Amino acid sequence: MAFTHVCLWTLVAFVLTWTVFYLTNMKKKATDLADTVAEDQKDGAADVIIVGAGVGGSALAYALAKDGRRVHVIERDMREPERMMGEFMQPGGRLMLSKLGLQDCLEDIDAQKATGLAVYKDGKEADAPFPVDNNNFSYEPSARSFHNGRFVQQLRRKAFSLSNVRLEEGTVKSLLEEKGVVKGVTYKNKEGEETTALAPLTVVCDGCYSNLRRSLNDDNNAEIMSYIVGYISKNCRLEEPEKLHLILSKPSFTMVYQISSTDVRCGFEVLPENFPSIANGEMSTFMKNTIVPQVPPKLRKIFLKGIDEGAHIKVVPAKRMTSTLSKKKGVIVLGDAFNMRHPVVASGMMVLLSDILILRRLLQPLSNLGDANKVSEVINSFYDIRKPMSATVNTLGNAFSQVLIGSTDEAKEAMRQGVYDYLCSGGFRTSGMMALLGGMNPRPLSLVYHLCAITLSSIGQLLSPFPSPLRIWHSLKLFGLAMKMLVPNLKAEGVSQMLFPANAAAYHKSYMAATTL
């Protein structure tokens, strides 16, 4: 018995000794890491390095600098970008922009006010405006369309007017890493010299073609769903420039919208398996023979104008990529380098600005960004808090894009017709869907409700006037299609984040209320 007691007490003493040693060692490592980064920050070094000075990088630089952070931004090309994406700012995005103090960046760029959609299908037209009487939305319920490059340059000027923001033109080659902690970047400056920059926090915000994403997440590979083809018709103005014109054409959707007082963006989706060549003229033939006849007469002249005048045709892959946090400390990824959804909902900038707003608020209490463990806690919190907005937009974009593809399958076409009927029926259906689309009501559960309502109404149309065996079969196929659209997004975004309303309520209270942050 005495021997047993001795063994037991020896074991207890060993466990206690090991625990004390482990905790002391962990504390020492955390202290050493903080001291190392603090040492790196001497002599005016940066608190934060931002890779990329697009919409996200510039907006984040401004927000963090206003909080007193020293920010070093490294951008590959400071010329005004010529992009086809990022030309439409939803009402929710404008709210986020104003909360960051950047609302004036939409001024003096000839941005056009947009009050909603005009939707066309099979010769019919209907309006789907943003809800005006929405007591839950604390900002003017309208969108803006513009030249992306002009907007980016405004953001850059605003950010780099602050004395604690340093802008440098250069190409980031890799992240500097030490024992699983990112300490900075290696980059080539404008003169072609390879150099390094150190900071306790590095933000990767270099867009959908990010060359740093793979070094942080092996499984973060973007999936190309289709291609968006577009061009600008110049020196013209739409009859209804305040609307984004969405045409449910075949093989997929077509969009026409005003991006300045004299320029109109024309674009359409092409599926990968049937992509016409631009070089040999197949694309122009495809546009004239397939797309143009489906464009409504009041839009057709402007749509043709760009083709006939030889407007530069741009092709952009429509990518999808779920967000995944990096296991490495001292780094966070934002924007299209972090999370992408189909661009048909034109909400990428809105999600990005929401992310910046959240990250800024979470970082504000931290006086020392060199504590990698505390910063990691902030990043983990950020990932959860962003879900109401990101999950709503991601699910809506990815589901909506599948519905808009034309098909000879009766079930798929019934779903497509059901979306048109539901979106354009007026009342709470239209206002509810447009509030979701515009980022005015980022509640995933509300989106699930509307998707289920569209499915049930589409099934009702299929079964009408009498539920024959063939109609029942098509209805079952339609239900299966709806589940294929919804379930993968539930899995990707998280069931709890999608179906529990408390998260959305907390997000709305913290980030969409009328009070400024």
Swiss-Prot record:
Keyword annotations of the record: FAD, Flavoprotein, Membrane, Oxidoreductase, Transmembrane, Transmembrane helix
Compartment list: Membrane
An individual GO BP term: sterol biosynthetic process
Membrane-topology descriptor: Multi-pass membrane protein
Keyword Transmembrane: yes
Any one cellular-component term (Gene Ontology): membrane
Cofactor requirement: FAD
Gene3D superfamilies according to UniProt: FAD/NAD(P)-binding domain
Presence of the UniProt keyword Flavoprotein in the record: yes
Residue ranges crossing the lipid bilayer per the database entry: 3-23, 45-65, 447-467
GO terms, molecular function: flavin adenine dinucleotide binding; squalene monooxygenase activity
InterPro entries in alphabetical order: FAD-dep_OxRdtase, FAD/NAD-bd_sf, Squalene_epoxidase, Squalene_monox
The EC number(s) this enzyme carries: 1.14.14.17
Residues reported to bind FAD: V55, G56, E75, R76, R83, F88, R156, V172, D336, M349
Tissue: Expressed in seedlings, leaves, stems, inflorescences and siliques.
Top-rank taxon, per record: Eukaryota
Associated pathway: Terpene metabolism; lanosterol biosynthesis; lanosterol from farnesyl diphosphate: step 2/3
Reactions this protein catalyses: squalene + reduced [NADPH--hemoprotein reductase] + O2 = (S)-2,3-epoxysqualene + oxidized [NADPH--hemoprotein reductase] + H2O + H(+)
The protein's role, per its UniProt record: Catalyzes the stereospecific oxidation of squalene to (S)-2,3-epoxysqualene, and is considered to be a rate-limiting enzyme in steroid biosynthesis.
Family, per entry: Belongs to the squalene monooxygenase family.
PANTHER family referenced in this protein's UniProt entry, alphabetically: SQUALENE EPOXIDASE 5-RELATED, SQUALENE MONOOXYGENASE
Stated name of the protein: Squalene epoxidase 6
Species this chain originates from: Arabidopsis thaliana (Mouse-ear cress)
Gene: SQE6
